[in-house]
């Protein structure tokens, strides 16, 4: 009996971390994080997989958020996902009207391809094309990747605490 319960638990847990969900976008946190409401009125926080958008207080952070909002806010989307991040957000590819929203953010230069975690060729190509055309954040001569921006912010906080 205990073995059956364990097997059922593992199957249900796995299904939570692999698959597809659909819902209406009800919140845009920033340029790579949204919240959707599914048909059961459950909220799901989604981190767009494979991209890293500028932080809210970083150059192009608000433009990135606004563009993502123009693509998905109030619309029905599908999310294909494999896992969750350390904050419990679903890591997924968001589709609106059949378009890969993650890819669209890269095409207009309002996110970096998060190569550390993703190797999608189309994402790398979109980032390169936006960079070459100096679109979005690529207008800056030396844009700072969000990961570096966050690290510098943590270091400043630690230094001021000492």
Residue ranges of each PLM-predicted region?
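Small beta-barrel nucleic-acid-binding modules, primarily SNase/OB-fold domains
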Residues: 2-4, 10-162
């Amino acid at each position: 009996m205990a073995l059956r319960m364990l097997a059922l638990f593992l199957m249900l847990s796995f299904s939570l971390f692999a698959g597809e969900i659909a819902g209406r976008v009800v919140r845009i946190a920033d340029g790579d994080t949204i919240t959707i409401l599914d048909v059961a009125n459950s909220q799901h926080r989604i981190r767009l997989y494979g991209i890293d958008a500028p932080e809210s207080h970083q150059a192009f952070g608000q433009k990135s958020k606004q563009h993502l909002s123009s693509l998905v806010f109030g619309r029905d989307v599908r999310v294909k996902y494999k896992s969750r991040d350390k904050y419990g957000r679903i890591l997924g590819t968001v589709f609106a009207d059949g378009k890969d929203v993650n890819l669209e953010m890269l095409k207009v230069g309002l996110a970096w391809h998060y190569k550390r975690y993703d190797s999608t060729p189309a994402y790398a190509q979109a980032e390169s094309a936006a960079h070459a055309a100096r679109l979005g954040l690529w207008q800056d001569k030396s844009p700072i990747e969000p990961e570096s921006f966050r690290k510098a912010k943590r270091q400043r906080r630690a230094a001021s605490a000492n």
